[in-house]
Amino acid sequence: MNTMNVIIADDHPIVLFGIRKSLEQIEWVNVVGEFEDSTALINNLPKLDAHVLITDLSMPGDKYGDGITLIKYIKRHFPDLSIIVLTMNNNPAILSAVLDLDIEGIVLKQGAPTDLPKALAALQKGKKFT
């Protein structure tokens, strides 16, 4: 498989650590950035050669907002970046609204530890993960 460069964004340092450790087990995944807020993420995106952003849905808003506002901004300004939302929110209305933003996948934090690697593998095959 081709190497996939991934950025992780979550406002909880322990979650960032856990995601990174999980992704380090996948030989074709390279973590190129980790961010705890949307401002740091957006300010650094142009400098990073990333294929995929794995982002929490609820992070401190800062200048660029969070959730749907942040995803809309990224889709508008970085259209080639694939987005996987990692969230603990399982509200069907919110998940539907997020999927309507044409993201590449949603992974629930309360899901199986294998869900995130499966989502990335689906992306490698040109598929979405929901």
Regions found by a protein language model. Give the residues of each.
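Two-component/phosphorelay signaling modules centered on CheY-like receiver
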Residues: P13-G33
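Acidic, metal-coordinating helix/loop segments flanking the phosphotransfer/catalytic sites
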Residues: E34-V52
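Active-site residues of response regulator receiver
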Residues: D56-L57, T87
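The short loop immediately C-terminal to the conserved phospho-acceptor aspartate in CheY-like receiver
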Residues: S58-D62
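Short amphipathic alpha-helix used as the core "switch/output" element in two-component signaling
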Residues: G65-P79, S96
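C-terminal output helix
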Residues: A93, G111-Q124
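As written
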Residues: V98-E104
